[in-house]
Each structure stands twice: as C-alpha cells, then as structure tokens.
C-alpha cells in the first residue's frame, strides 16, 4: 500500500537514527519450506510455502543486500507464476500477501477493525493460488530484506527510482532462473507505488533482461506523479479527486454503483473542469461549482463556497465526519477514527487506517514466517518503514516522468501483453480518476481492452471488503484466461 510522499504529509513521531552497520552482517537463514492446505470453493488445495532469500550484487559483483521472498507453489507443469510487490516506498508485500491474494489472510483495513484484534490467519477465499503460483517480494529495507552496505551507499543503491527497478528486475529474473520457471507464463501485481513499479519492471525485464511478462495487474496504482501538481493553474488535481469524494457520499447513502458514478465522472471531466478553467471570466462559474459540488459531496455549502468548489483532501477528510468527531482516512474516506485533536486548525494525527494496520500485519507475518514456516530469524520485521520512505529520492526526473511511458512502450512491444488497472472508488491517496484519464490519453494498440480500468467499492485496499475482493478475483481470472 501507500504512495510516495503520503507518509511525509502526516504527523510522524521522530525516530532515532539507525545504528551504524556492523562490519560483518550475520547471514540470514537458509530457505525454509512447509506444506500447507486451504479449502477454496469446496476443494482442498495442497501447496508449499517457502521463505527464502535472493542475494543482490553491485556493479563490483560484491553482495550488496538480501531480498527476502515468500512463495506459494503447487504442483503442475503449466502453472503461471505471479510476482507481487507493495509500495510506499517502504512497504513490505504483507498487504497483498495476507490482505488480498495469498492463501491465508488476516482481517484489517475495514471500518471497525482494531489493531489489538487477534491476528488470526484464516483461509483466504479471494486467493489467486488456485490459478497461479505466487511470489511476494520485499524490497530492501522492508520486511526482513536488508542492505549490507553503509547507510550512504544503501540510499544510493536502493532508495532511488531507477536503481529500485533495476535490482528488483534482477531479483525476479534470478528467482525464475533458480527455480527453472523462465518458460512459465509470468505476471506482475503491484499496489500503490508498487503499481508504479510494475509497468516499469515489465518494460525493463522485457527490453533489458530478456524476460517478457504476460500480464500486469496494477492495484490502486501511482502511475502519474505529476497529475495533481500546480493546483493554482491546472484543474487536474480537483478533477481527479472530486469523483472519489462523491463516491464516499454515495456509499454513505447506500447508493454507490457504476451507474450512479457515471454522471459524476461525466461532470468531473466536463462541466466541472470547464468551470474551473473559466475562473473569474465567468461570474456564474463559482455559483455553479458550489451548487454541484455541494450536491455531490453532501458537505456544508458554506464550506464548499469558502473552498471555491476546490476541495483539498485533508480538509475534506475532517469536514465529512466532523459531526461525529471523527477523521476519515485518505486511503478510504469512510474508514474513520476519533480525532484526538478536534479543535486544532488542521489534522495533527496520523492517518486512521495507516495507524491501524501495522500491528495485525506485523504480528501475523512474523508468526507465520518464524513459527509456521520455521525460518528462524531474529531480525526486526518492517511491515512499513518510515525510514525508507523518508530517505527515498523523490526529486528524480525518472519519478516525475511516471510509469506511463514504460507502460506505453511495453504494451506497444508485445501485442499479447494485457494490463488491468484496479481501484477502490473511495481512495483519495491514488484516486481512480487519475488512472481513467491517463489510460484515455494512451493510443489504442490493437484491442482497446488490453489496457483496462476497473473500480470497486472501498478504498486503497478495497480488497479488505469481501465483495470487492471477489470481484477483483473474477476480473483477474478473466485476464489470466486470455493467455
């Protein structure tokens, strides 16, 4: 989960500097395996869970780090393999693993879930394991993956946009070669900043390492980092976020559907954008904006007028639930918590959802890795690393360019490659409208459905809702069935 820069926008308690790295870093354990079963759709699936490492080497062929993976595999000659990454940067793959598509899951991320709930793993009805093997990758600095270099060299080699793509591509290549799976059908799935990674990984693997992906699933992706810039001039920041705010209001009224969202989307990309561009040249534009935005969001009209019909995300998340003394989450504005500082002029606490998911995912994953699989490690597990996020090179030209050029080139080069982009309606961290507008500006290369966008009830982690998770599984099955 997460998109770059979001962690910097919330209140974070200062952390002590990391201790100096020892001269010799003790080795991680050898790969460990355990046989497991789940019940899925009336069938029993037997599979092997593996926790292991892939070494990373620098330009001098010296080992620079160790990437830890969790793999779930079943017997079968023709099974595809799917590589999964989360985002941040600084997030491990635990959210896709134990929240979305792995064979076991722990409940988190929905309204009413508590960090102190017992993190019990149960069979996951939304898993993809029955139709693909799964390999979850934790980038350096997340999970148990670690650098063996100095802090300065680690930042240079691992916490920059291009180098991140280069070493992760090699990790995927090395896993395929080590496990004799280069001839398998291959897929990538990435969430949030992981959704930025997977188009770029696809193109780099295809063009530089000679490994072609069959399909890509981008979950709540961060495709186009500059789309929301320059809000004083461009209408795009407001056009991309208004539909998700309206979706949250429709959901609170139990009216959210693709049908009710259609006129919202049409307004956002039509009259709303036009009136924003008109500005003071049309004295009636502001009145039209305020009336329609008030109707769509259900907010107080005076509040909308003060904002000029341009609703800043943080202000919206407080205003939407102010009467209840609650805050909405940027990841799903209808997931709330009490506002601990209700009289402050701006939000003073961390995001409600972000705060609540670290404990259950960390506890469940550490117990699974060490006790269930038997990968006996004493290191700390980082489900979410603020340190990695804070050290990331956010000023690089490659990051500002976004993932869309790589997406276009990868799709153009392989006429059989298919890409599914999926979002939750309520997500304000990576709004669905950004992907809709981005894809609509891409040229049609063969079948228009080769690159498609789907939306589901929920937010950034919409898969925490059983109905949305089931709908995602159905759409992904259809994608895999094309190959």
Q: Which residue stretches match the model-derived regions?
A:
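Short alpha-helix in the alpha/beta-hydrolase fold that links the catalytic acid
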Residues: 417, 431-441
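Catalytic histidine-centered segment of alpha/beta-hydrolase-like enzymes
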Residues: 459-468
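Glycine-rich nucleophile elbow surrounding the catalytic serine of serine-hydrolase chemistry
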Residues: 190-203
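Alpha/beta-hydrolase fold catalytic core
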Residues: 283-429
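Conserved acidic catalytic loop of the alpha/beta-hydrolase fold
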Residues: 166-184
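Alpha/beta-hydrolase fold nucleophile elbow
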Residues: 181-193
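N-terminal cap/lid subdomain of alpha/beta-hydrolase-fold enzymes
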Residues: 16-21, 61-159, 440
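A catalytic-pocket lid/entrance helix-loop region that shapes and gates access to the active site
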Residues: 104-107, 206-298
């Amino acid at each position: 989960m997460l998109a770059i820069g979001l962690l910097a926008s919330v209140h974070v308690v200062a952390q002590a500097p990391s201790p100096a790295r020892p001269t010799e870093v003790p080795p991680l354990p050898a790969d460990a395996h355990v046989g497991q079963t789940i019940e899925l759709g009336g069938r029993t699936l037997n599979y092997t869970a593996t926790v292991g490492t892939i070494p990373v080497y620098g330009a001098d062929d010296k080992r620079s780090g160790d990437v830890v993976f969790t793999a779930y595999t079943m017997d079968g000659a023709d099974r595809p393999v799917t590589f999964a990454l989360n985002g941040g940067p600084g997030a491990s793959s635990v959210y896709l693993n134990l929240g979305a598509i792995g064979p076991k899951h722990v409940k988190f991320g929905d309204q009413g879930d508590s960090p102190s709930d017992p993190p019990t793993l149960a069979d996951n009805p939304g898993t993809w394991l029955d139709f693909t093997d799964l390999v979850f990758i934790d980038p350096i600095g997340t999970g148990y993956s670690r650098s063996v270099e100095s802090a300065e060299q680690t930042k240079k080699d691992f916490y920059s946009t291009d180098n991140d793509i280069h070493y992760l591509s090699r990790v995927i290549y090395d896993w395929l070669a080590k496990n004799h799976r280069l001839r398998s059908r291959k897929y990538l799935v990435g969430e949030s900043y992981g959704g930025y990674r997977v188009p770029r990984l696809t193109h780099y693997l295809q063009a530089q390492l000679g490994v072609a992906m069959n399909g890509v699933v981008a979950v709540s992706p961060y495709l186009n980092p500059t789309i929301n810039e320059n809000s004083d001039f461009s209408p795009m920041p407001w056009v991309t976020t208004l539909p998700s705010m309206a979706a949250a209001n429709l959901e609170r009224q139990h009216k959210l559907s693709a049908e009710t969202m259609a006129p919202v989307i049409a307004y956002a990309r039509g009259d709303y954008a036009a009136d924003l561009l008109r500005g003071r040249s049309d004295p009636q534009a502001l009145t039209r904006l305020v009336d329609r935005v008030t109707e769509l969001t259900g907010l107080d009209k005076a509040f909308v007028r003060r904002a000029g019909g341009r609703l800043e995300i943080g202000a919206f998340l407080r205003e939407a639930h102010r009467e209840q003394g609650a805050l909405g989450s940027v990841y799903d504005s209808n997931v709330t918590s009490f506002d601990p500082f209700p009289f402050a002029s701006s939000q003073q606490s961390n995001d409600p959802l972000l705060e609540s998911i670290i404990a259950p995912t960390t506890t469940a994953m550490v117990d699974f890795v060490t006790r269930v699989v038997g990968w006996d490690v004493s290191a700390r597990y980082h489900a979410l690393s603020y340190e990695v996020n804070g050290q990331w090179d956010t000023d690089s030209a490659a990051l500002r360019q976004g993932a869309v050029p790589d997406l276009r080139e990868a799709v153009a080069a392989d006429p059989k490659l298919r890409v599914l982009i999926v979002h939750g309606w309520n997500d304000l961290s990576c709004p669905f409208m950004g992907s809709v507008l981005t894809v609509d500006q891409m040229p049609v290369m063969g079948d228009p459905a080769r690159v498609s966008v789907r939306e589901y009830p929920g937010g950034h982690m919409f898969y925490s809702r059983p109905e949305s998770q089931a709908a995602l599984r159905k759409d992904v099955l259809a994608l895999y069935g094309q190959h």
